[in-house]
Amino acid sequence: MKLWAGRFSKEADKKTNDFNSSIKTDSRMFNEDIDGSIAHASMLAAKGIISGEDCEKILAGLSDIRNDIISGELMIDPDAEDIHTFIEGELTSRIGDAGKRLHTGRSRNDQVAVDIRLYLRKDVQSVTKLINGLIAALDGKAKEYARCIMLGYTHLQRAQPITFSAHIGAYIEMLRRDLGRFEDAAERMNLSPLGSGALAGTTYPIDRAMTAKALGFDGYMPNTLDGVSDRDFCLELLGACSILMVHISRLCEEIIMWCSWEFKFAELDDAFSTGSSIMPQKKNPDLAELARGKAGRVIGDLCGLLTTMKGLPLAYNKDMQEDKDAIFDGMDTVKMCLTALTPMIATMKMIPENMRKAAAGGFINATDCADFLVSKGLPFRDAYKATGELVALCIKNGTTLEELPIDEYKSICPLFDEGVYDAINLENCVTRRGM
């Protein structure tokens, strides 16, 4: 079945059909397409545009088609042009001429626009639920190792002592912002484009507010050209997906390092690790590595759709068929990563003794040593210089600030006293900072 066959004297070449078809991508929206058609048909009947009898046939037929697809009794035709064509054709074959009235006052342009918004509205709920699950796993891990002291880095150089819970807390804050981005995008997306027609609305006395309300939208898009040509919501969601995946990638990078023999800060559960086909000793953090790699894929989806949209004149263009490949892949990838990583993190074991031992080196309490002098009245820049000289002395003598005798401290600055050892104790350092 072709919805546009009347004007043409030749059948489309098979290569044209194959290239033009989007059924492999948009078939997942069959539920949303049926929901949109039910709302549209009900409105048409309410406005007297189609008869109540035809509307009843349409609604019953659409309900049967939905049930048959879900049960597997009806298979979606892989040769159909798109899901809209397939469902309308199937409906007409079942109920006759009444099915031909369904598309009155509607274009596939506004039909697909409403379908994808309905589908993504549900998908966003799935993603936010998964993000909350990852936050819960991270929060549980932070509480489990709340007082575990570890190295804090800047420039990947040892910087200051921190707690594991503070470190993980940073990722929790990132994920909370991610939640906000998805929620904000979903709110802007929740306007109905149905009734926009091909681009210029329709001459039929339709009720756009009625269909918007029936489909759970907050209202409808006032400009019909924008209604069919807007894909900002896809770009916004892909932007949210990309930022989320950047955060996930950063977390995974650290987990990968922590699980290495060089760090030995953490160990993943066997159920969430893999091995090598040739090296018997290997225990690889493949889930974390795959998630890190998939960040590039999602960012690519965003860049691809941005590039597709950047040169399109108003209103609808067939280029926009690429939107679903990008947004579905981005959202699917995010859900896959969140689903895999949450139990991996929940079962991950930290090794506090190794983390504490590593924190003892690298003079990460030097700032606290300088702050001790400031507490004695020395200007910070002078305290900074004196502490730098102490660090140089320790490096020369192969010792640490904790091991350096008080006489050596006093040789650099007479304001030092025995209290400096309490000041540079790592546990005291993190406590004073409220970590």
Name the predicted role of every residue range.
Residues 40-50, 119, 166, 235-243, ...:
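Short, well-ordered beta-strand elements within core beta-sheets of diverse protein domains
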Residues 52-53, 150, 183, 220, ...:
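A local structural micro-motif
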Residues 121, 143, 151, 157-311, ...:
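Charged, flexible cofactor/metal-binding loops and thiol motifs
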Residues 37, 84, 88, 234-237, ...:
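Short runs of predominantly hydrophobic/aromatic residues within well-ordered alpha helices
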Residues 1-201, 206-212, 274-275, 286, ...:
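A helix-coil-helix interface module used to build multimeric assemblies
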Residues 1-36, 97-98, 279-435:
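Glycine-rich cofactor/substrate-binding loops
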Residues 40, 61, 65-68, 90, ...:
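Generic, well-ordered alpha-helical scaffold segments in large soluble proteins
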